[in-house]
């Protein structure tokens, strides 16, 4: 009898331990799933630069086939836009049709603006603020404050290292003073700005040597890093806000980010390369 009671008691203890362990493991698993993952915003800036390289090679390949098709600024801008769209369609980060559509839609907005500048004879293609008018009511006062400070950094510095250092300090302020929702747009903007300035600092001569002599891409004035960077950031911010409204997700390595990343990448690539082409033409 004692043997049976002992066996039954042992069974109860074992069952209790099993349930306790299972509950603990389930709780840990549940906690790990709900724990937010850290976002590497640098991936957005890096993808932006990949887009610029892609478009450079796209334009180089297509102009080599028949240079006579690209006699005007509008012709060249149209080719650049097609290259931008092809990049977004093949981007490793945009993993589904919805994300690709968000990115392409946002990339079209700066090209529409640049085309209107060409048609109306407007020389300046720089937006006044670091965000398009259509998202003004969707940004918080804090976001506008930070973006205005970023505007000052881009306007008041001609040295690329000074600009990057200024943006790094601004990122510290964003992390300490802004909400999680505000940070996404702002930190993607600083990432885009840093990567864009570095790219054109390193590659502007490459673009000019490839296309400048053949197409006489020169405006007779010094290339403005600030102008490119400001358009980059502005359309990246606009694209990010619009992408967040539309929704969708972007896979960045082990991360899955909301649709603002797709919009930010699309808007920034179009804003950067379109403005740069109009400057050097």
Task: State the predicted function of each range.
Residues 3-6, 30-220:
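Acidic/polar, low-complexity intrinsically disordered N-terminal segments immediately downstream
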Residues 7-17:
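Sec-dependent N-terminal signal peptides
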Residues 11-12, 99-101, 187, 191, ...:
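N-terminal cationic amphipathic segment used for targeting or macromolecule association
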Residues 23-27:
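C-terminal motif of bacterial Sec signal peptides marking the signal peptidase cleavage site
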Residues 225-253, 257-281:
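Membrane-active amphipathic alpha-helices enriched in small hydrophobic residues
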